[in-house]
Amino acid sequence: MADPAECSIKVMCRFRPLNEAEILRGDKFIPKFKGEETVVIGQGKPYVFDRVLPPNTTQEQVYNACAKQIVKDVLEGYNGTIFAYGQTSSGKTHTMEGKLHDPQLMGIIPRIAHDIFDHIYSMDENLEFHIKVSYFEIYLDKIRDLLDVSKTNLAVHEDKNRVPYVKGCTERFVSSPEEVMDVIDEGKANRHVAVTNMNEHSSRSHSIFLINIKQENVETEKKLSGKLYLVDLAGSEKVSKTGAEGAVLDEAKNINKSLSALGNVISALAEGTKTHVPYRDSKMTRILQDSLGGNCRTTIVICCSPSVFNEAETKSTLMFGQRAKTIKNTVSVNLELTAEEWKKKYEKEKEKNKALKSVLQHLEMELNRWRNGEAVPEDEQISAKDQKSLEPCDNTPIIDNITPVVDGISAEKEKYDEEITSLYRQLDDKDDEINQQSQLAEKLKQQMLDQDELLASTRRDYEKIQEELTRLQIENEAAKDEVKEVLQALEELAVNYDQKSQEVEDKTRANEQLTDELAQKTTTLTTTQRELSQLQELSNHQKKRATEILNLLLKDLGEIGGIIGTNDVKTLADVNGVIEEEFTMARLYISKMKSEVKSLVNRSKQLESAQMDSNRKMNASERELAACQLLISQHEAKIKSLTDYMQNMEQKRRQLEESQDSLSEELAKLRAQEKMHEVSFQDKEKEHLTRLQDAEEVKKALEQQMESHREAHQKQLSRLRDEIEEKQRIIDEIRDLNQKLQLEQERLSSDYNKLKIEDQEREVKLEKLLLLNDKREQAREDLKGLEETVSRELQTLHNLRKLFVQDLTTRVKKSVELDSDDGGGSAAQKQKISFLENNLEQLTKVHKQLVRDNADLRCELPKLEKRLRATAERVKALESALKEAKENAMRDRKRYQQEVDRIKEAVRAKNMARRAHSAQIAKPIRPGHYPASSPTAVHAVRGGGGGSSNSTHYQK
């Protein structure tokens, strides 16, 4: 470490403009600026700082005034600190961070990230840099890592030089401004902010961004290191103004407490008389211990509000800045000595120690002589000048055994120092233990949250299962009710069927009895008629008068009976004729509908088979067409690439010919000059033989040089040709890949359009099938109505049959009583019976035909439903295939983009490898840390206008 030097803390004062709330409130602008270093608040005293920045100061001007010099100092091996102090909503975060990615409004931290690398790019190429960054916040007086949110209570320890540091904080190695900005974005996203009455984005914690830079000269092995603390303090708050409550109020308490501890440290350092500085009252002051009164160049930016509403806080902030301006820091370069330098320093200290020992011996001898009462002459005494020249640089006494009191005090002081050291060590151990317990508590808390989430998800799943079980139970109950209803209906149908069967049997037996009785009566009637005719023949002559009267009576009765029978038959014939006509029409309609359904099914099967054949042919043709198109596109791409390659080669050939011509011209000039020299030297050949020999040697050297130039030119030409061939090969591969991907994309688009058209066709077919299903349902309903009509007509027939049987029984009885009038009535009754039996037989046939047709339609129904389900499944399969095709297209597009990015990275890396040499930024590889960009090599950034290249000579 170099010799220390004393410097003061720089204090910059920045006033923000009035915000909208203050303008609407009508607040007065109270600061008055006098020059660049003085500001007056109202009618009060002037406040003088290193620089006063008015509201119209740009972010770039703030950076140039506050931070630009510190960046240079850090790169020269010094420590640096920049932090913003002020009340809430005074512009601290805007000053330190601003808008991170806005070139005009970005603050000090992002500008430093770019400026550091700009300085490195302009430094010596023999320098190698290691840059690592950390980002943490102090929230509720606990150190929380913003790059690893699981570390919530980190401890502050001291290294071997008694410099505080945060133990266990995440460190990221960076090699470019973009990586630094990525770290800042990541940490900023994890920082605590809240909304108050004074600020919409109020910082609820102190954030510290630490940049650690180590540089090494690879030739001289000189090593320098510097740390840069960039601190964004949370603002002091008045609860009456911010309206904080709840958790925000607790945060405000801790913020004010830590800022009060910072004020106490500043006051103690400003007074300069206190032996104890309360660094340990707050973790923030403990971390900034080296920045306040230690080995660090520190700049404080005090941010103030210009509003009269915040006048008291503004004056308090200005007083804080004036106190801080009086603090002196002792800074020195953080230099790591080499072995040779340590050896020289050891020899120097050894010589100094030897001189001090000789002085000590002379003084002891002189003291003994004085004690023995001997007077020592002045020329033998050691003068004060000699003592001063031989004193060590520190003011420790040379003679430490003058009085035993000094030894006792030193021993007691060492004892106290050891005790303080042990207490500090115990405190650090307690901090470690608290940190471990906090991390364990956080892990347990996270596990509890995970268990709660798991329990909640289990509870949700249980509720879903319960709902599903309830729904299934309800459906089961409904199904049971339906089954019961169906069984009940079947039982009722069975009972009705048994009843109807019993009734039919009863009616059949009654009909048979009536038929037997009718046959008996007919036989009896025939016998009686025969006997009557015999009796009439026998008594014809005797009863002629009676016979004529009887014949007249029979004739009248026959006419009356015929008239009655004819009317009955005619009425019955009309009724039965209407029923038969309706049954015939229904039978014809059902048979016609059945034939149409069968023809439609056959037509649909034919169309499906034809469509499948056409689809197969079309798919085969499309595959052949796609293959041909791919082949044609590949050939066209190759032809185009070869044409471009030939053009490039022609241009390069012309360039080489031009260069060859220029070289030939130069060679001709040299030969002409050589000939001129030979002609000029021929006259003086004898006199200047020695000079000619020298000329021959020069000529040989020139020819050798030309030959070496020719060989170098040839090598360079071959190398350029190899590079051109390699680049052309890469370009051809990229073009071929691009052509293939474009063709694949076009093929996928065409497949998508085809699938879409097929989907539309399937929807049309599905609509047709649904329409056909509706027609079938309508036919089923019509058939049910027809069956009901047939049942009613059968019931009517049964009723008519009963009436007919009753009427027949009545007439038979009458015919028995009226023997003479039975002939005509018997014929009419037989005619009625035969007609009714024929109608009954026809109705039975029609009923059976309707039942058969209904059964056929019911058999066709499952087939049609199966085809409908198959069509729906086919539609779903087409939809899933379409979705899968879209996903494949997206994956191919992503893969193509990744391949293009990879090729771009490879080309960029090759281009960067040709850049000029400058200072390097090495990025070591650490076990357990995933790399941010390339995992294969260590990145090194080169300055002097260069880019980044790969450096594999240093890995950790």
Curated annotation (Swiss-Prot):
* Disulfide linkage: none
Give the reaction(s) catalysed.
ATP + H2O = ADP + phosphate + H(+)
Which residues, by range, are in coiled-coil regions? 406-923
Residues annotated as region Globular? 859-956
Q: Where in the cell is it found?
A: Cytoplasm, Cytoskeleton; Cell projection, Dendrite
Question: Tell me, what is one Gene Ontology molecular-function annotation carried by this entry?
Answer: microtubule binding
The ranges of region (Disordered) come to 910-956
PROSITE patterns according to UniProt = KINESIN_MOTOR_1, KINESIN_MOTOR_2
Q: Does the keyword Nucleotide-binding apply?
A: yes
Cross-referenced SUPFAM superfamilies, in alphabetical order? P-loop containing nucleoside triphosphate hydrolases
Q: Where is this region: Microtubule-binding?
A: 174-315
Biological process according to GO: anterograde axonal protein transport; anterograde dendritic transport of messenger ribonucleoprotein complex; intracellular mRNA localization; motor neuron axon guidance; mRNA transport
GO-annotated cellular components: axon cytoplasm; axonal growth cone; ciliary rootlet; cytoplasm; dendrite cytoplasm; distal axon; GABA-ergic synapse; kinesin complex
Keywords from UniProt, A to Z, are:
ATP-binding, Cell projection, Coiled coil, Cytoplasm, Cytoskeleton, Hydrolase, Microtubule, Motor protein, Nucleotide-binding, Phosphoprotein, Transport
Q: What is its EC number?
A: 3.6.4.-
Q: Which residues carry this modification: Phosphothreonine?
A: 403
Highest taxon, organism lineage: Eukaryota
Q: How does the annotation summarize its subunit structure?
A: Oligomer composed of two heavy chains and two light chains. Interacts with GRIP1. Interacts with KLC3 and TRAK1. Interacts with ZFYVE27.
User: What information about domains appears in the record's comments?
Assistant: Composed of three structural domains: a large globular N-terminal domain which is responsible for the motor activity of kinesin (it hydrolyzes ATP and binds microtubule), a central alpha-helical coiled coil domain that mediates the heavy chain dimerization; and a small globular C-terminal domain which interacts with other proteins (such as the kinesin light chains), vesicles and membranous organelles.
Its job: Microtubule-associated force-producing protein that may play a role in organelle transport. Has ATPase activity. Involved in synaptic transmission. Mediates dendritic trafficking of mRNAs. Required for anterograde axonal transportation of MAPK8IP3/JIP3 which is essential for MAPK8IP3/JIP3 function in axon elongation.
Q: Describe the family membership recorded for this protein in Swiss-Prot or TrEMBL.
A: Belongs to the TRAFAC class myosin-kinesin ATPase superfamily. Kinesin family. Kinesin subfamily.
Protein name as annotated: Kinesin heavy chain isoform 5C
Taxonomic classification = Eukaryota, Metazoa, Chordata, Craniata, Vertebrata
